[in-house]
């Protein structure tokens, strides 16, 4: 849900009329690889446009972030006229949000783990599901995510992600990640706190506006 909320924060910054549903579908698409039965981390690196030599979960400094960022910008510049622009913008927003989150949230968390690594990662995953469901519940008071995603137009990005996998991801989100999670103890979470995640959404939105929309999107249109 954080990616969807970041995309919503930015939708009017593009100064063009967007097909909202396709834009939102684009922003959940990079993680569609999780819906593949033979999922491998290399598939996620490809869908997230990792430059050669970068590894998922190991973007922990400014140098790696900059290499990843340039790969994303170059992909946009080279493909902006080849694919549905609403879908592509949503896709790029997701990737740029991950660049920001890797450097400002995930890396500090991983680097600061003191104790059992596997236990902390399991706690992170569990808390992340809960906070996403919390945001989903709030979002659902005004909008129907099921309808939005099904109205969007999925596309295949050649060599990156397929339309069929994106369609499976919609089902996976609605049947698992956004099922009813017990969030009665969400205020006690230690890693993925609501306030911190809200700050992350705002920070990522400002970051994307500055380094892509203001400085690159208009130039690259």
What feature does the model see in each segment?
Residues 1-221:
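N-terminal leader/auxiliary helical segments
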């Amino acid at each position: 849900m954080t990616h969807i909320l970041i995309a919503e924060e930015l939708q009017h910054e593009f100064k063009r009329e967007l097909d909202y549903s396709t834009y939102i579908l684009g922003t959940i698409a990079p993680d569609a690889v999780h819906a593949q039965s033979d999922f491998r981390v290399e598939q996620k690196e490809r869908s997230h446009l990792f430059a050669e030599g970068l590894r998922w979960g190991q973007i922990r400094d400014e140098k790696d972030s900059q290499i990843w960022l340039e790969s994303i910008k170059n992909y946009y510049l080279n493909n902006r006229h080849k694919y549905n622009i609403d879908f592509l913008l949503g896709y790029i927003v997701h990737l740029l949000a991950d660049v920001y989150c890797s450097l400002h949230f995930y890396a500090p968390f991983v680097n600061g783990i003191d104790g059992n690594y596997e236990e902390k990662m399991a706690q992170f995953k569990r808390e992340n599901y809960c906070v996403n469901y919390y945001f989903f519940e709030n979002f659902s008071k005004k909008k129907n995510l099921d309808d939005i995603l099904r109205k969007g137009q999925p596309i295949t990005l050649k060599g990156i992600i397929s339309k069929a996998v994106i369609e499976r991801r919609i089902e996976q989100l609605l049947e698992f990640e956004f099922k009813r999670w017990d969030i009665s103890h969400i205020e006690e979470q230690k890693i993925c706190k609501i306030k911190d995640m809200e700050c992350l959404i705002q920070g990522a939105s400002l970051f994307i506006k500055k380094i892509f929309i203001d400085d690159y999107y208009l130039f690259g249109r």
